[in-house]
Curated annotation (Swiss-Prot):
Residues 1-24 are annotated as: Disordered. This is Uncharacterized amino-acid permease C11D3.08c. The keyword Hydrolase does not apply. Pfam families: AA_permease_2 (PF13520). GO terms for molecular function: amino acid transmembrane transporter activity; gamma-aminobutyric acid transmembrane transporter activity. It is found in: Membrane. The keyword Lipoprotein does not apply. The chain crosses the membrane at residues 53-73, 78-98, 127-147, 177-197, 201-221, 246-266, 283-303, 336-356, 386-406, 411-431, 453-473, 481-501. Belongs to the amino acid-polyamine-organocation (APC) superfamily. One of its GO terms (biological process) is amino acid transmembrane transport. Coiled coil: none annotated. It is a multi-pass membrane protein. GO terms for cellular component: membrane.
Length: 550
């Protein structure tokens, strides 16, 4: 190749790089202008691409490890119950992802749910509704994170038992593991957005690999003693629940799918860190749920196909984890130790994604003064990390984790609490959309199917809320009660009392989302006038600056 050709190639490459950079700059400017039109000054750097924001949603599910930690809830009515509750539960959530995706496209802010409800509600009620929704959504995100870390701590203990069968774990040791994981994950999450975006891509790859490894290992390692027939996989409905009614036992099995895939909406929490957020956020919600539905069903079918007929032995296993026992039965202790270790790592990556979403939700609500101490909690580090918000979620998780010291039933109710709080928060803006009819569609909108999808979402979520408030046993004693209603009730009472408290209550200072931008006419293409220069504007390639200077 001649020197002229090389020089021409370099020039073309440089021109292409400049055009890509200019395109990204224009896209970022459009995102920032949309955010400023909603009243907020851009404070995060936009490092999340379509792939990394998909990773945020899909990674928040932690599909395979989350299923491994929660399949015990879907074993209420046999193999068929496990298989069909998963696919039905996930399909019923698709309209929810569409409805929330429309809201995220219309109003792509980290405030998400409580900002949406403020925009869609009436002027007379929107401040109070926004206040309640803010508290409930923060509770939901923080609790789904805490429940996932608890699941990880249970899996760590199962690993210890697999490696040393004589080991007998205690609840105090589990709380110690739980607390240690909280501190480690908090430290791993206090990193800049550009690093988190790369971690999300790693998370996607690792989650898929672990899922494939689990499916192949169980299928290859099973034999005639553990392998089940198709009629058992799809048609066995034996009642193993604490309820006598088979129909209700099947409904209780929905706890697993609604808990596992609950992270699909977390892309809205990082909308202010995403490029082309109005399209990317709904894309991540819907596509991640679709992938999880199919891949998760394959995992459930494989587990049921290789777990044998003796459910009682698996449920009563000393490992405390059904999937761990299924692995031991099929691939032996050493194989189970290796594969289950991968599941624990995958679940920790899942926890990172969940803490990212929870901390952004806390930051956004504190930016609007919703939580006591917001002046400090909303601060960002020099690297644009909401460290104080992360620490608040850490403190809450340490406190709610004390339920470990009560009993397994008490801490298991945290799984229910997470979904209940999130579903209440999800349903708020959808209800306001029907009542006040103020919704303005964004670039993602399904037209005539929009309202039916929103209506179905409300029906399904409130049905699930009622189901999750029930205890695991038909006639529970004090130790078997569902603690979800206790924690939820405490938070609801606190936020309502704090709002109406004379002189210092939220009603005296909280008016909803607080605009943080300068006046609209002080911005051009997302740049403040006092910082404006030709180099800061997305000018065409053939623009000649001499035309102005001359």
């Amino acid at each position: 190749m001649s020197d002229i050709d090389k020089e021409s190639l370099k020039q073309n490459q440089k021109q292409w790089e400049n055009e890509v950079e200019l395109g990204e700059s224009r896209e970022a400017n459009q995102d920032d202008e949309l955010l400023m039109s909603l009243g907020y000054k851009p404070e995060f750097t936009r490092e999340f691409s379509y792939v990394s924001i998909f990773g945020q949603s899909f990674g928040s599910m932690g599909l395979c490890p989350a299923m491994a930690g929660s399949l015990i809830f879907s074993m209420n009515c046999g193999g068929g119950g496990m298989v069909w509750s998963w696919i039905i539960g996930c399909i019923c959530l698709i309209p929810v992802s569409i409805s929330l995706g429309e809201l995220a496209s219309s109003m792509p802010t980290s405030g998400g749910l409580y900002f949406w409800i403020f925009t869609l509600a009436s002027p007379s009620s929107r401040a109070f509704l926004c206040w309640v929704c803010g508290y409930v959504s923060v509770l939901g995100y923080a609790t789904i994170y805490a429940s996932t870390v608890y699941s990880a701590s249970s899996m760590v203990q199962a690993l210890a038992v697999i490696g040393s069968p004589s080991y007998s774990p205690t609840k105090y040791e589990q709380y110690g593991i739980y607390a240690a994981l909280l501190f480690v994950i908090s430290a791993m999450t206090a990193i800049p957005s550009r690093v988190i975006a790369k971690v999300n891509i790693i998370n996607i790859t690792f989650q898929f690999l672990v899922s494939i490894i689990l499916i192949i290992a169980l299928a290859a390692g099973s034999d005639s003693t553990t392998r089940n027939s198709g009629s058992f996989i799809f048609g066995d409905f034996t009642n193993y629940s604490g309820w006598s009614n088979m129909g209700w036992a099947f409904i209780l099995s929905f706890t697993t799918p609604v808990w596992v895939v609950s992270g699909f909406e977390s892309s809205a929490a990082v909308a202010e860190e995403s490029t082309n957020a109005a399209k990317a956020a709904p894309f991540a919600m819907i596509s991640s749920l679709g992938v999880a539905t199919i891949l998760g069903w394959c995992i459930v079918i494989t587990v049921v196909a290789t777990m044998g007929h003796d459910f009682n032995a698996i449920l009563g296993s000393s490992l405390g984890q059904p999937v761990a026992q299924v692995l031991v039965n099929n691939v032996g202790n050493k194989g189970a130790l290796g594969i289950f270790s991968l599941l624990v790592i995958a679940l920790c990556l899942n926890c990172i994604s969940l803490l990212i979403a929870a901390s952004r939700e806390v930051f956004a609500f504190c930016r609007d003064g919703g939580i006591p101490g917001s002046r400090y909690l909303r601060l960002l580090t020099k690297q644009k990390v909401p460290l104080n918000a992360i620490l608040l979620v850490l403190l809450y998780s340490l406190l709610v984790g004390l339920l470990i010291l009560v009993n397994v039933t008490a801490i298991s109710s945290v799984f229910n609490l997470a979904i209940i709080a999130l579903y209440i928060a999800y349903s708020g803006p959808l209800m306001c959309r029907f009542v006040y009819n103020k919704f303005q569609p964004g670039v993602f909108y399904v037209g005539k199917w929009s309202k039916p999808a929103a209506l179905w979402s409300l029906v399904w979520m409130w049905f699930m809320i009622l189901m999750l408030l029930f205890p695991q046993y038909q006639k529970p004693n004090q130790d078997e009660m569902n603690w979800a209603i206790v924690v939820l009730g405490f938070v609801m009472v606190f936020c309502v009392v704090y709002y109406y408290l004379p002189k210092i209550g939220g009603k005296t200072f909280f008016t909803g989302p607080i605009p943080t931008v300068q006046q609209e006419n002080e911005y051009i293409s997302g740049v403040p006038l006092n910082e404006l220069s030709l180099s800061s504007l997305p000018l065409p390639k053939d623009f000649d600056q001499k035309q102005i200077t001359e």
